[in-house]
Amino acid sequence: TISCTNEKQCYPHCKKETGYPNAKCMNRKCKCFGR
């Protein structure tokens, strides 16, 4: 898991992981969403 303070920090990681730059920052951790 990637730690974060806002979801913008998660986008590059999630784009790599799921192919979509969709993410939320929950409890200081990135949560990726496909589509």
Curated annotation (Swiss-Prot):
Site, as annotated: Basic residue of the functional dyad: K24
GO molecular function: ion channel inhibitor activity; potassium channel regulator activity; toxin activity
Assigned GO CC terms: extracellular region
SUPFAM superfamilies in the cross-refs: Scorpion toxin-like (SSF57095)
Origin: domain of life: Eukaryota
Subcellular location field: Secreted
Disulfide-bonded cysteines: C4-C25, C10-C30, C14-C32
InterPro entries named in the record: Scorpion_toxin-like_sf, Scorpion_toxinS_K_inh
Keywords of this entry: Disulfide bond, Ion channel impairing toxin, Neurotoxin, Potassium channel impairing toxin, Secreted, Toxin, Voltage-gated potassium channel impairing toxin
Record-annotated site: Aromatic residue of the functional dyad: F33
Signal peptide: none
Tissue: Expressed by the venom gland.
Family: Belongs to the short scorpion toxin superfamily. Potassium channel inhibitor family. Alpha-KTx 07 subfamily.
Function: Potent inhibitor of the A-type voltage-gated potassium channels. Most potent inhibitor of Kv1.2/KCNA2 channels. Reversibly block the Shaker B potassium-channels (Kv1.1 sub-family), but with a lower affinity than PiTX-K alpha.
The record's note on its domains: Has the structural arrangement of an alpha-helix connected to a beta-sheet by disulfide bonds (CSalpha/beta).
Protein name according to UniProt: Potassium channel toxin alpha-KTx 7.2
